[in-house]
């Protein structure tokens, strides 16, 4: 499942995939795969992404049944 919430939060913050990758210590490809739903990040990476974007884990990674 695509992570639209993550992509929207990144774009709203004015960050490219590379910018977010640099902030979180991963590659741009990893951020792209997470956004496409092709990669399940570790909890530590989820926390780093959320902190970098000023969001909570729920804001970015919680999926409601109707989503």
Predicted region positions:
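Phosphate-coordinating loops and pocket residues in cytosolic domains that bind phosphorylated ligands
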Residues: 62
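Short, Lys/Arg-enriched C-terminal cap helix and immediately downstream tail that follows
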Residues: 8, 43-44
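Short amphipathic helical patch at the helix-1/turn junction of helix-turn-helix
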Residues: 11, 39-40
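Key DNA-contact positions within bacterial/archaeal DNA-binding proteins
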Residues: 18, 29, 58
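Recognition helix of helix-turn-helix/homeodomain-like DNA-binding domains
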Residues: 26-39
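DNA major-groove recognition helix of helix-turn-helix/homeodomain DNA-binding modules
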Residues: 44-59
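Short basic helix-loop element that most often maps to the first helix and adjoining turn
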Residues: 4-23
């Amino acid at each position: 499942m695509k992570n639209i919430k993550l992509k929207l939060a990144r774009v709203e913050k004015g960050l490219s995939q590379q910018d977010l990758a640099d902030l979180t210590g991963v590659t741009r490809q990893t951020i792209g795969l997470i956004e496409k739903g092709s990669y399940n990040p570790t909890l530590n990476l989820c926390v780093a992404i959320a902190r970098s974007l000023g969001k909570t884990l729920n804001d970015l990674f919680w999926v409601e049944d109707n989503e």
